[in-house]
Regions:
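HIT superfamily nucleotide-processing domains
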Residues: 1-125
């Protein structure tokens, strides 16, 4: 069965797309730790990020770097934090989080409302 992220890439589940190319896809996290929290995934489904071959891994990180630069330009933040957790969805992914302070990487926060998602997605696009 396809992961939820593969279903997002296939268009079966809606997302707030931030960036896309032939191999990678970036979209707003539905349970963000900060406004602009974005997930970056390979379109090719692989559960564990370190199971990606070297070329795919390097491509994913280069794509994430470009997305992080766009987030940094569009969102008020000091830096864009990056983390890989990988336990919640069996599809390799990178979290990009606009940061004001280290505690902004707290992954136990309240969910955003639909209007907030729309506003942030429009701002980042």
């Amino acid at each position: 069965m396809a992961s939820i992220f593969s279903r997002i890439v296939a268009g079966e589940i809606p997302s707030y797309k931030i960036a896309e190319d032939e191999h990678y896809y970036a979209f707003l996290d539905i349970n963000p730790v900060a406004p602009g929290h974005t997930l970056v995934i390979p379109k090719h489904e692989v559960d564990y990020i370190f199971d990606l071959d070297d070329e795919e891994y390097a491509g994913l990180m280069a794509f994430a770097k470009r997305v992080a630069a766009a987030i940094k330009e569009a969102m008020p933040c000091v830096k864009v934090g990056v983390t890989v957790l990988g336990l919640e969805v069996p599809h390799a992914h990178v979290h990009l989080v606009p940061l004001q302070k280290e505690t902004d990487m707290n992954f136990f926060r309240q969910k955003l409302t639909l209007p907030a998602f729309v506003r942030i997605a429009l701002y980042l696009n």
